Curated annotation (Swiss-Prot):
GO BP annotations, alphabetical order: translation
Annotated gene: rplP1
Pfam families for the chain: Ribosomal_L16 (PF00252)
Name of the protein described by the UniProt record: Large ribosomal subunit protein uL16
Function, as annotated: Binds 23S rRNA and is also seen to make contacts with the A and possibly P site tRNAs.
Keyword annotations of the record: Ribonucleoprotein, Ribosomal protein, RNA-binding, rRNA-binding, tRNA-binding
Family the entry assigns: Belongs to the universal ribosomal protein uL16 family.
Listed transmembrane segments: none
Length: 137
């Protein structure tokens, strides 16, 4: 699963996702991509589940690029613990994705295979996404 090797601080504020994505909105590596339509936090487990679904359908042919990285530590307190006594320990890692962000890119497969692979990957994610492809001139 994806997570940072080391961080400057162990815990972070929750934060909010405002507006559209500043960067990562264009296809840079592959010919096909999965674009985010709504803002959300995506966990490392969800990214990994989507990646597995995509690569499994492609039968190891072609190439997959993951364009998001879970660098946000999400904390939680144990069950049945009273409020207070500090912030909980890090439970999992997440990535903030804003609308317009490209999450996955594919190349080396036909369009119908890429479309279906990304559809299966999108089913593992808790957000609305859109299939996009590079415009060849």
């Amino acid at each position: 699963m994806l997570q940072p090797k080391r961080t400057k601080f162990r815990k972070q504020f929750k934060g909010r996702i405002h507006g559209a994505s500043k960067g990562g909105t264009d296809l840079n590596f592959g010919a096909y991509g999965l674009k985010v339509v709504e803002p959300e936090r995506i966990t490392a487990r969800q990214i990994e589940a989507a990646r597995r679904a995509i690569t499994r359908y492609m039968k190891r042919s072609g190439r997959v690029w993951i364009r998001v990285f879970p660098d946000l530590p999400v904390t939680s307190k144990p069950t049945e613990v009273r409020m207070g006594k500090g912030k909980g320990s890090v439970d999992y890692w997440a990535a903030r994705v804003a609308p317009g962000r490209i999450m996955f890119e594919l190349d080396g497969v036909p369009e119908d295979v890429a479309r279906e692979a990304l559809r299966l990957g999108a089913a593992k994610l808790p957000i609305k996404t859109r299939f996009i492809q590079r415009i060849v001139e």
